[in-house]
Amino acid sequence: MDLFFRKYGSGPPLIIVHGLYGSSDNWVTIGKALGRRFEVFIPDQRNHGRSQHSDHHSYELMRDDLLEFMDKHSIGKPILLGHSMGGKTIMFFATSFPERVNGLIVVDIAPKSYFSYSGESVQAADHLFIIRAMENLDLSKIRNRDEADREMSSRIKSGRVRQFLLKNLSRSKNGTFHWKLNIEVIRKDLVRILEGLNASEFERGNQITGFPVLFIRGANSTYILDSDIPFIQKIFPYAEVTTIPDAGHWLHAEQPEMLIEKVVRFVFGE
């Protein structure tokens, strides 16, 4: 699949992979800042941003999209940074093609599954709520983004989250709005998006040890709990886990300078 991407700077290659509902647009500020030290590539994943839509959405497909992207742009062995769904994408990639990875930076996501048939998963419930809120927005009646924001405010109270989601709105030539995000497929394949890696595949010496690994979590986020660290280290036994204070799941928007600092320190030891 041909992925739209943005590129900044020069230096060792770094690929930033965005999360669910996101796009390269959310990472421009961080991409430009990291471009002072890296050659930064930020692709839009399938069914997101300006990349192509597909009838299917899974980590195996996104992993293969990333491999195709790297081969197309002659990126041999980059550092991979992924947030949320993008973090899962790069974990699936790194465990499948470890020889193509120079370092792994996973932002606020664990390798576990976040799906629960019992309905106990806060994250699964949150995603279903967000998808329904987007689907219930009557775009035929929306004249501008402020109206869309007001309509969504009755369902989604956080202004920050609404603005993040509304970055997916695009105006057609006839003046009507549409979602850049392929909401129908995201809803259909949400269970697959919430799935995790199988830790049993990495027993008996199959763990990933050939490159440094950093997990960065937000102090106010519930995506990486202390109880998840043993699971992380079953797959990545030498992984470091660090926490950014005063940040939730979207820590790249809440604490961008701290995130940049941790990335630079991890790669260059500064």
PLM feature segments, named:
Residues 95, 102-145:
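Flexible "cap/lid" loop of the alpha/beta hydrolase fold
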Residues 139-193:
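Conserved alpha/beta-hydrolase catalytic His-Asp/Glu region
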Residues 173-235, 240-243:
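Conserved serine/cysteine hydrolase catalytic core
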Residues 44-49, 110, 247-248:
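Short beta-to-alpha linker loops that shape the active-site pocket of alpha/beta-hydrolase fold enzymes
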Residues 4-53:
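Conserved HGGG/HGGXW glycine-rich cap/lid loop of the alpha/beta-hydrolase fold
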Residues 32-35, 41-85, 89, 95, ...:
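Active-site loop/oxyanion-hole signature of alpha/beta-hydrolase fold enzymes
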Residues 13, 39, 74-79, 100-103, ...:
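Structural signature of beta-strand start/N-cap positions in the alpha/beta core
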Residues 238-270:
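Catalytic active-site module of serine/aspartate enzymes centered on a nucleophile-bearing elbow/loop
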